[in-house]
Amino acid sequence: MSEWLFDLGNSRFKYAPLHGNRAGQVQAWAHGAEAMDAAALAALPSGQIAHVASVAAPALTQRMIACLQERFTQVRIVRTAAECAGIRIAYADPSRFGVDRFLALLGARGDAPVLVAGVGTALTIDVLGADGLHHGGCIAASPTTMREALHARAVQLPASGGDYVELAIDTDDALTSGCDGAAVALIERSLQHAQRSLGAPVRLLVHGGGAPPLLPLLPGATFRAALVLDGLATWATAAASP
């Protein structure tokens, strides 16, 4: 039976075949706030079951679901659950916990105790204990979003460009250093708190399209490009279990 995993984020769309309980080879496309590139839609696979997670705008999500319903016998939409595959979400109302964060924790379950940092449009941080208990987290603007926000308020500040240095001597480098440094500082502070709170070493997993530039500043981190899709694979496997 052909099953596929689909992750519709705020700015990128990823999909992969389900291989066992992991995601297979990943394909990714950028998308706008309300529209998907025609080439991306034409390239979509078809099969028996599509497992779909989305944090994109409702209109875009509905268009994508309608497109998949034409290609798949069954389309399953992921919702955050209070408990799943050995993890328990800390939120009193799990429906308010983003499905991307939920799936990232499922993908990271085998690495617990772990801090999971997702770097996309937002920077999300969540801590998962060895017993599968979610200890909460935080949300901030990612470095890319910080840059775009600064440019929107002060157009003379470029929205991109520059390299990270500890003390920059030009504006482009200063912006990159400040925004990347702010993200790294929040991740490091959260990791230190997690280790004190759990009383044990805590692994650091990072994922998302904005993560690679931060890796040189986080020498202890492991990058998992397909973490959300791996979590979606775990969800799909759990959903299929009797």
Curated annotation (Swiss-Prot):
Q: Does the keyword Transcription apply?
A: no
Active site per database record? 100
Q: What is its main location?
A: cytoplasm
Please list the cofactors this protein needs. Answer: NH4(+); K(+)
Q: Where found?
A: Cytoplasm
Q: Which domain of life is it from?
A: Bacteria
- The record lists ATP as bound by 7-14, 121
The Gene Ontology biological process terms listed for this entry are: coenzyme A biosynthetic process
Q: Which PANTHER family match?
A: TYPE III PANTOTHENATE KINASE
Quote the HAMAP family the UniProt record gives.
Pantothen_kinase_3 (MF_01274)
Subunit and partners: Homodimer.
Annotated protein name in UniProt: Type III pantothenate kinase
- Per the UniProt record, the source organism is Xanthomonas oryzae pv. oryzae (strain KACC10331 / KXO85)
The gene coding this protein = coaX
